[in-house]
């Protein structure tokens, strides 16, 4: 999904729908159903990859006959390979674009959980001191309009903090990425109409100039770096003093061990927050009730004083048309297990990667979609 969007598509994906919950969803049967040596291949999101590996290991006790492999290739690859039938399950932090959905009506976007991103900075002078950043300031950094850590826009957010006079090194993903999709949504939705404001000479009108997507036309910033996957982002930020970059929350523990500092991000209500179970849940509660039947919805930059602004659905991208009933049944049962609080969405699994489970109403929508897999 290389085309980026500059219009406010969030109003299309967020408004005008009501939850269409079908009665009579059958009780989950994953515990009783077992596969006869069925092989399923997953690839895609590096954000969900650590959790997916945990799911595979745990589900092997439920269905020993299912042989499943997982790959961390990036969300764009997860979507494209699922569409091309190269894999049975693509995973993605991004939903398919409207054009992709229209061209591939047999492809489902099924939320499995809710995750988030952090913005990590490598500032040796500020170890243990939370840094405050906003969408407009990050847009300025990633456009090259804000070049130094002690620049006025950053200093204005961090009163009383002695910021280093060093050039900022922005780090971004090299490949098509759902993390890029989420991060650029945050920049897009938090910087509307800056060309009409007095700050236009300092910041950057990301919404009209760049927009969002799994791949975007990044502004050229001298000294900026690229990295592949969340693991590559973590390593690059950690070894580069004065770097900043976006990271899937499933890598939070590794970022902490590397001595990186997660920034407090400004939300719609002007509050600066870190991603916690409470702030991710608050953001989800603000927007998930607007989820349409196809479940393609932007969760970034949710309203509410307690809403962390960088969250998303984690999607399984799956075709309704499987090669045979055995494969269809194996995939369906596995996905039902993934979203069940008694299965893959148990706190013991989600807490390890700082994800939260789907709300009950959204789980019901995902069950409706899973029932279409044949």
Regions found by a protein language model. Give the residues of each.
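N-terminal secretory signal peptides that target proteins for export/translocation
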Residues: 1-12
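Intrinsically disordered, low-complexity serine/threonine-rich segments
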Residues: 5, 20, 32-33
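Hydrophobic alpha-helical segments with strong N-terminal bias
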Residues: 13-16, 299
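Bacterial N-terminal signal peptides
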Residues: 16-29
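Flexible loop/hinge segments at secondary-structure junctions
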Residues: 33-374
